[in-house]
Amino acid sequence: MDPGIANHTLPEEFEEVVVPEMLEKEVGAKVDVKPTLTTSSPAPSYIELIDPGVHNIEIYAEMYNRPIYRVALFFSLFLIAYAYGLDGNIRYTFQAYATSSYSQHSLLSTVNCIKTVIAAVGQIFFARLSDIFGRFSIMIVSIIFYSMGTIIESQAVNITRFAVGGCFYQLGLTGIILILEVIASDFSNLNWRLLALFIPALPFIINTWISGNVTSAIDANWKWGIGMWAFILPLACIPLGICMLHMRYLARKHAKDRLKPEFEALNKLKWKSFCIDIAFWKLDIIGMLLITVFFGCVLVPFTLAGGLKEEWKTAHIIVPEVIGWVVVLPLYMLWEIKYSRHPLTPWDLIQDRGIFFALLIAFFINFNWYMQGDYMYTVLVVAVHESIKSATRITSLYSFVSVIVGTILGFILIKVRRTKPFIIFGISCWIVSFGLLVHYRGDSGAHSGIIGSLCLLGFGAGSFTYVTQASIQASAKTHARMAVVTSLYLATYNIGSAFGSSVSGAVWTNILPKEISKRISDPTLAAQAYGSPFTFITTYTWGTPERIALVMSYRYVQKILCIIGLVFCFPLLGCAFMLRNHKLTDSIALEGNDHLESKNTFEIEEKEESFLKNKFFTHFTSSKDRKD
């Protein structure tokens, strides 16, 4: 309802006559002051009606409303985030050493691109599963994927196996992050939402300073540095498991009749019906496969086409691009619009500008970050002469500063309750930061400039990244849609990662070899400098002509990447101005927790709101005419 009208008090006779009687004639249905479903509405099918995961988590939240329970729950989220956050910092470093050990360091972006394509689709997949089968069940599945992928990565002997392990790891990590974000949202009101969302991010404050020590202690033994997390992370998940089992116990003890069996579909439906209704339609398997193939065909070739031998004109680069754009994308759109019963991209949600432009922001966040961050560690070690410990800490500064700023802002939003001004301010900080990164991009004199730029980048990120997520959750309106909207936001975030990694990889693999060849005349030496930079710098130390040539090449390429990031900050700012500026209320969602409201209900609400506006305006102008 329009705020200007909401702030006026309707005359008594208007409230008594218009709402119960006149409104019924206008809407054409029996309505209350709070509209409900009419008997003429078609009964929802079993699949549309039942979301046991959403229903039960609301009951669990009631059982866990004591402060001591909430503290224990959020501490368990913190513990898991601490584990995967430290792993991420360390793995980011050792991934560079792993690809370099295969003499294929330039394929680092390809590995990242493949992982993020899988992660993007995995967000929606896990969100839908968690709504149906519950948060805890999907958390267990995610942990299994995480550990399995970690083991495969640590034992990989070539880039192919490393990429396969990375896909499983990323899928598991995606599920864990999503479930933690959703649980944090399930147990927090909108005005506390930003602070709750930052609980899983708080470990970055610690990990920034200790990850460098850990990587230095492990040294270049990247296999152990990655593999040890296959058992560390599952151990860190035990406290959350205890909390989830405890709240389930309390719910069964005090509200057993209200709970819905999370695997009821398996009992009520035959196996064939279950596979068709749940696995095929509800999860939209066809849509997921098509969108995965599309992004794989379009993005991965970008990172493979360059290098010492350009391959843009070869069939294995052109064919996937043609298949992706000409065949797969039209098929996906046709399926989603015409045939899918539960589209991956629900059009009724995306049409809301508060959701659509928030998704665009999510895309540009990671796209822009990858422009400066994809090869930042390599640039710091090779072109800025940083140690392993120093480079690891510097690359973590972004997360460190953003978490501190975002947490402080979380307390501010409890009272302020508006998000849009902070989002605009944060993006403005990014514009300045990328401008600084264009200037400070290499050589030993860039040390302080890069640190300052990354701190400013983190300051801006803390002001708008998670704030945008809180904004899009408010735009979802109902708790039932919160997990889906969150997954769309995180999926778009990962798609931005995929495009960013793809573009940065394309720039790196196509321009860097040429720049190195211009400055290093020996083809064999140039190939070594490009393919195995960490091995190269041990032989050609700081100050040697060969090292200076490599530094100048890195400076040139990093400048191009940062300019691309700077340019795309302006569309990011434009999207921020188009967002809704919701007031964050003392409820889980703007329209409460009733997740069984159908489309008919919302149509009645819209008609009621429009009707009340018109009638109030008529009454107001009539009264004014009478006074005149």
Swiss-Prot record:
Keywords: Endosome, Ion transport, Iron, Iron transport, Membrane, Transmembrane, Transmembrane helix, Transport. Its main location: membrane. Involved in the transport of siderophore ferrioxamine B and so has a role in iron homeostasis. GO terms for molecular function: siderophore uptake transmembrane transporter activity; siderophore-iron transmembrane transporter activity. Belongs to the major facilitator superfamily. This is Siderophore iron transporter 1. The chain crosses the membrane at residues 68-88, 107-127, 132-152, 164-184, 194-214, 225-245, 285-305, 317-337, 354-374, 394-414, 420-440, 448-468, 488-508, 559-579. GO terms for cellular component: cytoplasmic vesicle; endosome; endosome membrane; fungal-type vacuole; plasma membrane; vacuolar membrane.
